[in-house]
Every structure is written in structure tokens, then in C-alpha cells.
């Protein structure tokens, strides 16, 4: 009963926020215009209340749960099952290739699902039908890692500010596609020769800077992240971390990138203006090193201790998955974000034996969705639910999750699959902290 009250309260707050205007990175954080007052006696058309839905693209990595399609849950009603959107596969093809990423576009009213099978599929959110499918190259590409398709498509996609263009990673090769969100037409490519295995991505809210991550590092003489001037499609510099780069997050202006790397329970921080790694942040060794030294004693999804990192929108906390202890570990993030402080009192245990290998958050930073299927109250640091399918089965390897708001079948707000810093949320937090200090000082 307590969980239900918590969820309903969260949903009510979200509805109130939506009624005052939707906020999305795709419209630069601007609030949508309030409807003009109608003349007296005017009969207004019916407008449905906003709906808050969670879209989960399956199957994920190590998809032993046999899921297929995009599972939709109702965030306004205890995350109950709403629908499963199929990929149009024959029975003999199910569950289909692993899903490598998902993003959405407000103006196009579409979601986009990338697959290891060599395609990116666009779904019309008004009909839930396939609108178009993008295939990569016409001939075999150089690298076909982990069974990725010979056409070089596709890894994680990212919707650029404005919602009209998609930035899409090739499947572990050294270029990124620019795709028209409405039509699926290829608009161009960004070449990143020193980061040879494209994988994860984050973009600043103004669309000026992109951090393009590659599963690569010094062991193969390669960098891990390309810092790109997005309007000019130009690589500004490359960043090399201590090992191969895996999931990443960025602060509000992209001046800092935080990266999971192989062989580390924790993360590393780099300054994107200098291209230098500035700090290695590690969980206390006694908590993980013995388990990592004996992988037969513990299962590590993706083959590393930490595959999952996110930042609250206000940048007050950095969340990192800890596969060695079946938990999310949290670092407080004071000041300029260069010196996080581990806070064991905030640790969030998750389902044992099912590694939680990703994190996404709602735009308001109140709710997190993590890889083992857990739904977490971010402020309380507590699991409040589990993502489940139509049969009540927990969804595992939930690494491609979007929290979206609809009105009359039209997408009006969306999160993205990465949990990154937000300038307005950070500014509001800093103002609040300043006001609190001033009030405290005046009281003394």
C-alpha cells in the first residue's frame, strides 16, 4: 500500500508539472506555450489528460527472459502493463536480435530502436506501426564485432536538440550517422578514426558539443572519447582513459565527462576542454577487488565491475552500478564536479544475481529505471517497484528505457536513455543551497 501511495503521489506531481508546460531537452528546456483564453461561449474541443508512459525496448543483453518488442508501462497507475509493440518478426525469428539503443522525437512523434541485426526501426507513436527502417552501408563494413551486422548499423542513437535529427552510432566502427528523424534519410556522417568502436554518446542541451564514446583504450593504442563540434561535424580532440571506455555521462555544459572503464568498480573523470583525464574514482578496494580477481565466484554482466553510470539532473549525485555487491553506489558531487565524495549511506541494493547494468532517469530527476528492472525513488534512495510484463514477469537487462508524456496521442515530453546533468536543474539547486546558507548565517 505504501508503494502504491508513493507511486501515485509521484504521478500526480508529474501531471501537475505537465499541465504547466512540457519540458524536454529537444526544445531547449523551454516551456510549451499556455493555451490562449477562449472567448465566452466557445465550445472547446476535448483534450485528454496527460499520460505518463515508460517504454522499454527488449531484448537486452543476456536476454534470458525471452522478451521481444517494446514493452509499455503506465507510470500513472503503479507501472502496470499497457501494451507490447512488436517488431514485425515471424515466430521463427523471435525474440529477434539484441536491442542496442532507443531514442525518441517530439516533432516527429516517433521512437527509434536500434538493433544488432543491422537496422534502426522508427515507430509512429500515433499508430505504433513501423514508419521506416534504416539500414547502414550497402556493402560489408570493416568490423563486425559481437555478431553485429555487416552493414555497420547500429549502436546507441541520440536525438539532437530540436528533435529533427538523430545522431546514431555505427555498430562498433569509426563513424556516426546523422539521420532525418521524420524520413530516415541519411544526412551525413561524422568520422572518428581514433575512436574505432562507436558505442555510447551524450550531447549538450544546446547541441554544440557531442561526446562520442568508443569501446577502446590505450591497450590498442586508441582513444576512448571523441569531443566533437557538432554544428561543424568536426572532432576537436580525443580523450584517452586508463582502459576501454564503457557507459558515460556528462555535466550540464559537457565540460566534464564521467566514464565507466574496464577493470574498475567506479569511474574516471575527464576535462573535455583539455582532453585530459583528471581523476580516477574507485569504490574502496576491500568491497570489490577480491570478487573481481575471481570471476568464477561472481557474475559480471558486460565483463566489468561497473557498467552503468548516471548523474541526477541537478548534478548533486553520481550513481554507479556495483556488480560486485548487487547495488547502486552513490557519490555526492559538490562544487565544480571534479571531486565526488563516496556516500555509503545512500547505497541502493538491487535484486541479487541480476546485474543492474544501466540507469535512466525522468527529466525531473525523481525516478530512476535501472538494468535489473528496478524502479527507484532517487531522493529516497529506495527501490519502489519492478518493471514487469503482461504476465507479471520482471523485465531483465532493461537498458533501453524512455519516460514519455503524451496528450491526445502526441508526444509532448521525453527523457533520453542517458542520465546527464541539466543546466536549469543545477542552477536551481545552487540557488537553493545559497539561500539555505544565507538563512542559516542570518539565524546565527
Task: Give residue spans per PLM region.
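Gram-negative bacterial Sec-dependent N-terminal signal peptides
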Residues: 3-23
